[in-house]
Amino acid sequence: MKTVIARTSSKLARTPRMNEEIVGFEDVIENLRKKLLSETKGQDVISIHGMPGLGKTTLANRLYSDRSVVSQFDICAQCCVSQVYSYKDLLLSLLRDAIGDESGSRELPDNELADMLRKTLLPRRYLILVDDVWDNSAWDDLRGCFPDVNNRSRIILTTRHHEVAKYASVHSDPLHLRMFYEDESWKLLEKKVFGEQSCSPLLKDVGLRIAKLCGKLPLSIVFVAGTLSEMEKEVECWEQMANNLGGPKLSSFLEDRVIDISRLIRLWISESFIKSSEGRSLEDIAEGYLENLIGRNLVMVTQRADSDGMVKACRLHDVLLDFCKKRAAEENFLLCIKRDQSTKAVISHKQQAHLAFSKMDNLVEWSASSSLVGSVIFKSYDPYFARCPLSSHAFALSHILINFKFLKVLDLEHQVVIDFNPTEHFYLRYLSAHIDQNSIPSSISNLWNLETLILKRTPAGRLNTLLLPSTIWDMVKLRHLHIPNFRAESEDALLENSAKLYDLETLSTTYFSSVEKAELMLRKTPNLRKLICEVQFLEYPNQYHVLNFPVRLEMLKLYRFNNSKVIPFYISAPNLKYLKLSGFYLDSHYLSETADHLKHLEVLKLYRVEFGDHGEWKVSNGMFPQLKILKLNYVCLMKWIVADDAFPNLEQLVLRGCKDLMEIPFCFMDILSLKYIELDNCNKSVVKSAKDIEEAQVEDNQNTNFKLVIIKKMILQFDISHDKEIDNAFKRLASLPGVDSISIDMIEKKLTVGGDMNANEVRLVVGKLIDSGML
């Protein structure tokens, strides 16, 4: 007989607040309401998951108390599980709602209470709210009490953990509750402070700023609104609040605005946080850890790749970030050095394991007294460097490193230009910095423990090919090598006799000058998973050559600048999932022949590719069997012939700037997996064919998930260095006639401006903003 589960509590399960007002999430509520009232006969569990403070419970309660929903059910009952709970109390809470009284049931054993609840629900259509479920076992304890007799009964379940939501789901997919939009943040703040009244126009600007500083989290907004409600409704008071929010509490949410996933994983590995497991790479294990944190909503995803949906960037909520920083300080793990913080002020902390600096001068000052520090991270952009000539702020790396005897990580990711002259730092595993030189000294091999080498280049430096010494092939522990436009300076015979870099997984962006050199380098890197390279072959053979890429290669990007040329080889990569070709001339048979060697390809992107044979591309039956995403950007393609059985699993088709193409093949009407077509700056005949495909997909195939997006406006992209004055830059750009969208991607360092605008005027203004150091 089951009496009490391992998690027990003497108090009744917490009852959610029923009258809490909710503002925002209107689209989410409508979507969930439809699921609750759908015609699906079987029992369905509507799972809502997300990080603490998003308003999962409030949202669930709004649905649970919605008259249009409740009126469709015979019985409504709820319970709140929490991390520590009593199984008996949960059953009593549900029985109290189901039968109106549970006073005579408290003395019954748990199994009889569960049976009573099940029999009460059995003949009726019920709506159950199970709030705050922490693990699968808690759901297992309750699910047997909810019978499924095909009468459209529904269960709303809230949890912080994605795995729990997925585990409990039946028909409907779990809903990951998003952060607030900016307008929702303001509406909630205004509602909480002013009630039914409107905010004074004098306070609106600062109010909008305060709402933005709350980090799009409803809980933070409610907390701040409570404080504002008790303050004078004066601009000065609200300005003070805004300034306070810019301090160490809520502003820490924005301290590291986004965390680049690739960088994070490389740092984890360099710090030895990831333990090896037979048959799995360290990168795969690290990705598993990250997915676990995301699934538990401890880490928020801020950006996914538009190609495959993989996480590209994330962030920590301010509460969790503050907790991590405090624990790190308590355990002597991390010390963040502020701009004006001297070594004297925190002398007792000099032997921290990791130091994070926001000013380069601090690093120079601290280097003399931090010999045991293992990691140094320069974590923010210093405007000083934007105002000075590059040569005036190049730091001699050797002078800094000589004092950090046991340094494992040196991450100067922002624009700190260093004089790269490596010394014998045997422990260094991770190095990221900017350089202003065209060659690397052979002494780089002294860093024989190095696993990650990222050398970004100044705008002037990018114009020249960077020469790497032959000693680079002696660095057998390298896992990730990222240097724009580089080539190895070595004789073929020397390279042939060098060691293989078995651990190297990512290589970008190397420069291949011949097929033979490409073959030789690929033989020396047998375990590559990601390769980005420029192809500038001097000779182009009359006959195609099959170039065998490493078996584990999953991502390949091949570029050619200047005039389009034929790729002198077919690509053979049995496990390749992602392929991007840019700046090449392809005859009509090239992709067909290559496709035979790419059976697992899921993403294909062609950028400024010119199709030969009168601009024709033929795709035969059965080609690209696993392809999900196809993007054609500014390709010279006039006639596209696709067999009926090609692209059988295609989900997305994107055409941008394909001015010569006359139509999308009609066989796309019959691709049942197709979900999305996007057209940008294409011919009217292409638009018409896309609309015909949309009609066939939606009406004939009943593909309700299909979406057609037609973009008519102009899009301009610019390379930028930073976004520290982005608000002022946005205001300047937004004032230009025709500009209706501005976005920034600091992972890719790209500014995008869109609208029906004067392109030359926009380019002129952006150029001035960059020159002035605002971008």
UniProtKB/Swiss-Prot annotation:
<feature type="domain" description="HMA">
    <location>
        <begin position="711"/>
        <end position="775"/>
    </location>
</feature>
<keyword id="KW-0175">Coiled coil</keyword>
<dbReference type="Pfam" id="PF23559">
    <property type="entry name" value="WH_DRP"/>
</dbReference>
<feature type="coiled-coil region">
    <location>
        <begin position="16"/>
        <end position="39"/>
    </location>
</feature>
<dbReference type="GO" id="GO:0046872">
    <property type="term" value="F:metal ion binding"/>
</dbReference>
<dbReference type="InterPro" id="IPR027417">
    <property type="entry name" value="P-loop_NTPase"/>
</dbReference>
<dbReference type="GO" id="GO:0005737">
    <property type="term" value="C:cytoplasm"/>
</dbReference>
<dbReference type="GO" id="GO:0043531">
    <property type="term" value="F:ADP binding"/>
</dbReference>
<dbReference type="GO" id="GO:0016020">
    <property type="term" value="C:membrane"/>
</dbReference>
<feature type="domain" description="NB-ARC">
    <location>
        <begin position="17"/>
        <end position="237"/>
    </location>
</feature>
<dbReference type="GO" id="GO:0009626">
    <property type="term" value="P:plant-type hypersensitive response"/>
</dbReference>
<dbReference type="InterPro" id="IPR006121">
    <property type="entry name" value="HMA_dom"/>
</dbReference>
<dbReference type="InterPro" id="IPR002182">
    <property type="entry name" value="NB-ARC"/>
</dbReference>
<keyword id="KW-0611">Plant defense</keyword>
<feature type="binding site">
    <location>
        <begin position="50"/>
        <end position="57"/>
    </location>
    <ligand>
        <name>ATP</name>
    </ligand>
</feature>
<dbReference type="InterPro" id="IPR032675">
    <property type="entry name" value="LRR_dom_sf"/>
</dbReference>
<comment type="similarity">
    <text>Belongs to the disease resistance NB-LRR family.</text>
</comment>
<dbReference type="InterPro" id="IPR036388">
    <property type="entry name" value="WH-like_DNA-bd_sf"/>
</dbReference>
<keyword id="KW-0472">Membrane</keyword>
<dbReference type="GO" id="GO:0005524">
    <property type="term" value="F:ATP binding"/>
</dbReference>
<keyword id="KW-0067">ATP-binding</keyword>
<dbReference type="Pfam" id="PF00931">
    <property type="entry name" value="NB-ARC"/>
</dbReference>
<comment type="function">
    <text>Confers resistance to late blight (Phytophthora infestans) races carrying the avirulence gene Avr1. Resistance proteins guard the plant against pathogens that contain an appropriate avirulence protein via an indirect interaction with this avirulence protein. That triggers a defense system including the hypersensitive response, which restricts the pathogen growth.</text>
</comment>
<keyword id="KW-0381">Hypersensitive response</keyword>
<keyword id="KW-0963">Cytoplasm</keyword>
<protein>
    <recommendedName>
        <fullName>Putative late blight resistance protein homolog R1A-3</fullName>
    </recommendedName>
</protein>
<keyword id="KW-0547">Nucleotide-binding</keyword>
<dbReference type="InterPro" id="IPR044974">
    <property type="entry name" value="Disease_R_plants"/>
</dbReference>
